[in-house]
Amino acid sequence: MAAKYIFVTGGVVSSIGKGISVASIGRILKSRGLSVSVIKLDPYLNVDPGTMSPYQHGEVFVTVDGGETDLDLGHYERFIDVDLTRSSNLTAGEVYLDIIAKERRGDFLGGTIQAVPHVTNVIKQRIVKLGEETNVDVVVVEVGGTVGDIEGLPFLEAIRQIRNDVGRDNVFYIHLTLLPYLSAAKELKTKPTQHSVKELRAMGIQPDAILCRSDFDVPYAIREKISSFCDVPTKAVIPLTTVENVYEVPLILEDAGLGDIIMDALHLTGQPRDMSEWANMVTRMKELRDSVTIALVGKYVEYPDSYLSVREALRHAGLLHDRSVEIQWIHSEDVEKYGPDAMLSTANGIVVPGGFGPRGVEGMVETARYAREHRIPYLGLCLGLQVMVVEWARNILGLKDANSSEIDPDTPHPVIHIMEEQGSVTSMGGTMRLGSYPCRPVENTLAMAVYNERDVSERHRHRFELNNAYREVLENSGLIMSGLSPDGLLVETGEIKDHPYMLGVQFHPEFQSRPNRPHPLFGGFIAAAKLTLREGEQPPLPL
């Protein structure tokens, strides 16, 4: 059976939760026994977000096949519990690059290249191809940006055409909009929603359902008014009130009847609705009484979405151990300025996530030293492993000028250096070591104790690695190479001997954590960190 398509657009303002809404719709459909895939359409002209600043875009989410994608794909994977590929993110830059390459080759035989049909055809082909290749029941499509954006027009035209291409019974349009509250009038205003839907209809798209984002309860009379002006049944005008826990959103939408509306409109048959497992998880989150404090020491903490998957992975692990996780967002430059004692003394555990460039790295090195000397649980991700190695080389081996060649190209002791295959790379976009690669934890190590598997696969995004020229001397001094590539040439994980939990990894385990299945590295980290609630200097965890 051919896939059905659900398109989610946004109106009035951006950043009102389309990604969470799409992920929630996917969760609802999966709970009814349907298979689901998702694609995010981004109208910006970057080919992918891989070279975009975290301050503008947030984190870059890496897929199993090495795609550098929008952070919303992380929401999709966590909510729906699927592994997506680079095919689940399409940007305008990628579309235009494809078309221009074809034109230069002469594929269009001298024809005039236009937004319609050439741009729209590429967009449609990518959407339909995803449904065909994944062989799913439903493809949910998020259209980035806001209705009315100039760069989004070809994408809206493409999703309009798809309804005619695949049949009206196979497409469902959802419009997510904001209901602003005027405190002076003490009421929610519907006019922006009316105008947004009017503009959408002018493009030939009539929404089948409207999700109304609001910080306040939405009265039934407001829903009736929107229904009347926007030609949508009142039952399909669904309030979506702001909640503290985004994992509640699937339950809210299901209770509001969105699942039944979609199933009926698309003539889908599945299992009876059953969100009990998800509801139990959300209830457990609400009932957490004890907490654990984790210091996240990074370069981009002013914009926490830069570490969105790390934050969620910590949250998942906290739930596993019946702890809410309170994150202290600490800028690594502040550690340089004020010292680790002032910045880290109240933390039960420390995470140093990934990053690029020299800014703030010395603060991360000092953070690793503090965690080692004070026996505070430490989890280093990508750059977090590298600064752990640099700190050890400087303070244990006495190589005072040891560094990464990324940070100091002239260091006499490059304990971290560029990978051999990266040495000749000149282009920045899409050229790192990307995607899932195998790792083999070493017997009788913390890594093996945590994973309890001989072979694992983790997602990578890096150019630099531990320098094997220093590997023997590092290991002989107590820095254990506890996870290796299958050929034994690449150090994937390192850990400090006789420390409760000081583990660094060259990959990004946060991308594979799920609320119902926390990543073992984060689970082990929180298990160690929560012991500091009862004890000062904790004993080593048994292997």
Predicted regions and their residues:
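Active-site proximal loops enriched in glycine and acidic residues that flank catalytic Cys/His/Asp
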Residues: 10, 40, 214, 296-299, ...
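Short beta-alpha connecting loops at secondary-structure transitions
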Residues: 56-64, 243-248, 352, 373-379, ...
